[in-house]
Every structure is written in structure tokens, then in C-alpha cells.
């Protein structure tokens, strides 16, 4: 018996519709057992129905990262949720045949004081108040000073997060199977401060410095922590990875062109 659990966006009609259809389909298959939220830790697969935000929220619930994620897109963009709503049955048929296409996504472990978080996309520091002019921060790489950043903030992203906030701030696109740090300044005051890519084997420490007094640290767009001057945000790669089930014919570069219109003439 293959045990799985389902997380879906309860605020979206399309996601609710797919959830009901999927539940009916799975119950018709004797090989699958659908678990409730209380028993999610026993699941071999977790099905996420919604958009990228639903997957990121679901990621926080997943304690055992050995579980495999089946991400079904119920919306429009769905860069992380690559399985189309009309193609999910083939995924489950392939599971029964033992044919699974899995891609590992590496994520951060983030330590802020005594609190610990996981970040699949990014960690970023911004102003705590829109009225404040700038936020000043320093970054250290394995205890070596990298530089001081002045502006609206700074983003530290994974390759998975390279197509999210970091991209909007002018960062590069990086293929998601890599283990790297992308550091992207947000509206820097110094024109020489540009995005930089670092090895994933290092530890990054981000600190707030004067004249800033307070800042906000955001983890995957959902967790907000107010930090004071000289507080440390420690970021390193987890030894675990997230396993995402992909369609057989999935081609990353096709996804890049289809979802982000990369390289296309938009005029």
C-alpha cells in the first residue's frame, strides 16, 4: 500500500475541484491510501495542489524530507508546481509501474537567535518601516568579510529561488539542481554592488549594522523576524534535500521559456 497525504489551497476553487477529483481517483485505486493531516509523517508521497505559494507553505509542514512531493499546478504560472492538472493521473500510473522522475532541490537552514527555519526559495533582509531611508547590512562568508550593503535590502537565494524575488531584483537564473548561494542586493545605493554567486559549501552570516536600528528578515515570504543591530542571521545548506516528482517529458529549458518567456521577443 502506497501512503500519501494531500495539501491543497482551500481558498482557490480550481484547487478544491482538483482535490475532489484526485481523491475520487485515488480511492478507485486499491494501491493508494490517503492519510489525514495528523498522519502526514507516515506518508511516502505528499501531493500539493495549488501554486508555488501552496508548495512553500506545505514545505514548512514537511518534517521528513525523504518524502516525495507531487506538485500539481491549479493556477497559471506554477514554476515549482510543474504537473498540469490534466496530467496528474499519468504520474500515479508511473508510480505504480515504479517509474518515477525525481529532482532534488537543496534548501537553506536559517538560524536567527535561538530559532531555526528552512528556506526553499530565499531569505531576505528589508527595512522594518517604509519611512526609513535605507537598511545597512554586512555579509560574512566563513567568517571572512564579503561586503557592506546599503539600500532597500538584500536577498540570499537558492537556485530554486533564483526565479522568484531575486529575479525581480535583477539576479541571475540558475538551474535548480545546483547547490549555490545567490546574493542579490535590493535597490543598492552603490552602483558597484551587483549580484554575486557563491559556493554552497560555505556558511553565510548576515548582520544588521548602523545607521540602521531595526530590520525585517523574511523566510520564503512567510516568516517575519524583526532583528536589531548586530543580530546575526546564519545561513547554510541543509544536509537534506526536497524530492520533487516531475513529468517524464519535463525539460527545464522548455519550462523556462513557457513560464518566464525567457529569450522570447515580447514586442
Curated annotation (Swiss-Prot):
SUPFAM superfamilies, alphabetized: NAD kinase/diacylglycerol kinase-like (SSF111331)
Keyword NADP attached: yes
Entry's EC annotation: 2.7.1.23
GO MF term set: ATP binding; metal ion binding; NAD binding; NAD+ kinase activity
InterPro entries membership: ATP-NAD_kinase_N, ATP-NAD_kinase_PpnK-typ_C, NAD/diacylglycerol_kinase_sf, NADK
Catalytic activity, as annotated: NAD(+) + ATP = ADP + NADP(+) + H(+)
GO cellular component assignments: cytoplasm
GO biological process: NAD metabolic process; NADP biosynthetic process
Residues that, per the record, bind NAD(+): 52-53, 57, 121-122, 132, 150, 152, 163-168, 187
Cofactor(s), names only, from the UniProt record: a divalent metal cation
Subcellular location, record wording: Cytoplasm
Predominant location: cytoplasm
Residue positions of the active site: 52
This protein's UniProt keywords: ATP-binding, Cytoplasm, Kinase, NAD, NADP, Nucleotide-binding, Transferase
PANTHER family hit by this protein: NAD KINASE (PTHR20275:SF0)
Similarity section: Belongs to the NAD kinase family.
Functional note: Involved in the regulation of the intracellular balance of NAD and NADP, and is a key enzyme in the biosynthesis of NADP. Catalyzes specifically the phosphorylation on 2'-hydroxyl of the adenosine moiety of NAD to yield NADP.
Name this protein carries in UniProt: NAD kinase
Gene: nadK
Amino acid at each position: 500500500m502506497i501512503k500519501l497525504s494531500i495539501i491543497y489551497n482551500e481558498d482557490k476553487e480550481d484547487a478544491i475541484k482538483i482535490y475532489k477529483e484526485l481523491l475520487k481517483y485515488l480511492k478507485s485505486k486499491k494501491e493508494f491510501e490517503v492519510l489525514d493531516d495528523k498522519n502526514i509523517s507516515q506518508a511516502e508521497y505528499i501531493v500539493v495542489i495549488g501554486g508555488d505559494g501552496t508548495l512553500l507553505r506545505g514545505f514548512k509542514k514537511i518534517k521528513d524530507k525523504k518524502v516525495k512531493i507531487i506538485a500539481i499546478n491549479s493556477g497559471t504560472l506554477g514554476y515549482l508546481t510543474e504537473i498540469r492538472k490534466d496530467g496528474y493521473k499519468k504520474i500515479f500510473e508511473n508510480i505504480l509501474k515504479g517509474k518515477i522522475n525525481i529532482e532534488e532541490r537543496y534548501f537553506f537552514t536559517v538560524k536567527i537567535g535561538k530559532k531555526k527555519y528552512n528556506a526553499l526559495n530565499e531569505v531576505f533582509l528589508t527595512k522594518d518601516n517604509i519611512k526609513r531611508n535605507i537598511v545597512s547590512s554586512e555579509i560574512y562568508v566563513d567568517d571572512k568579510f564579503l561586503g557592506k550593503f546599503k539600500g532597500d535590502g538584500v536577498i540570499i537565494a537558492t537556485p530554486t529561488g533564483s526565479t522568484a524575488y531575486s529575479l525581480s531584483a535583477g539576479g541571475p537564473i540558475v538551474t535548480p539542481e545546483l547547490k549555490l548561494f545567490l546574493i542579490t542586493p535590493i535597490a543598492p545605493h552603490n552602483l558597484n554592488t551587483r549580484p554575486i554567486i557563491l559556493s554552497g559549501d560555505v556558511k553565510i552570516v548576515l548582520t544588521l549594522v548602523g545607521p540602521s536600528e531595526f530590520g525585517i528578515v523574511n523566510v520564503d515570504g512567510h516568516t517575519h523576524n524583526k532583528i536589531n543591530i548586530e543580530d546575526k542571521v546564519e545561513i547554510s545548506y541543509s544536509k537534506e534535500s526536497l524530492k520533487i516528482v516531475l513529468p517524464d517529458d519535463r525539460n527545464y529549458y522548455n519550462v523556462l521559456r513557457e513560464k518566464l518567456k525567457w529569450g522570447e521577443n515580447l514586442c
